[in-house]
Amino acid sequence: MSEEQILNTHNASILLSAANKSHYPQDDLPEIALAGRSNVGKSSFINTILGRKSLARTSSKPGKTQLLNFFNVDDKLRLVDVPGYGYAKVSKAERARWGKMIEEYLTTRQNLRAVVSLVDFRHEPSQDDIQMYEFLKYYEIPVIIVATKADKVPRGRWNKHESMVKKSLNFDQTDAFIIFSSVERIGIDESWDTILEYL
């Protein structure tokens, strides 16, 4: 059964933005969070898997997402875009606030089913990427690794880059690893198949 038969992925809208739990939606709809470095392509990932051009605002300027953005998908699922980490031009105080906001959501939200952790397929994961993965594993939060910008890596080097990313993360082979490109539309079905396993 395809994701379209289970939910209409094109029936999506931004629901609200929240700074803390008092602003979270008050229902039991399952949520999948999206985490990753600033400019890793979270907004492009959201727009691509939902078949929309600008539902999530993309920006070449890192640090654009400053709140938890909740996207309603067919009244059956929410995608939650959390602020990108690792953006150096944000003040320490602002980084600390973002960190607290993300940690509060990830560790206390009952609706959370899994986290899509996005990494840049072109490069070795950053220390922030590694810490995020370790954080999710420590709290036993199901994690899906999505390696973005695969179109920038020649296909003949994909195996090498996948091995590099997995080795750096000390990757748990029971977790999903998806190679993704919003430009070439690679990994969309695999992303949905994996997300739907957690609903």
UniProtKB/Swiss-Prot annotation:
Positions of the EngB-type G domain: 28-199
Gene3D superfamilies named among the record's database cross-references: P-loop containing nucleotide triphosphate hydrolases
Binding-site positions, Mg(2+): S43, T65
Gene this chain is encoded by: engB
Keywords carried by this UniProt record: Cell cycle, Cell division, GTP-binding, Magnesium, Metal-binding, Nucleotide-binding, Septation
Binding site for GTP: 36-43, 63-67, 81-84, 148-151, 180-182
Family classification: Belongs to the TRAFAC class TrmE-Era-EngA-EngB-Septin-like GTPase superfamily. EngB GTPase family.
Xref: Pfam families: MMR_HSR1 (PF01926)
GO biological process, one term: division septum assembly
Functional note: Necessary for normal cell division and for the maintenance of normal septation.
Cited NCBIfam families: GTPase_YsxC, small_GTP
UniProt-listed CDD domains: YihA_EngB
InterPro entries according to UniProt: G_ENGB_dom, GTP-bd, GTP-bd_ribosome_bio_YsxC, P-loop_NTPase, Small_GTP-bd
Cofactors that this protein relies on: Mg(2+)
SUPFAM superfamilies noted in UniProt: P-loop containing nucleoside triphosphate hydrolases (SSF52540)
GO MF, one annotated term: GTP binding
Name of the featured protein: Probable GTP-binding protein EngB
GO cellular component: cytosol
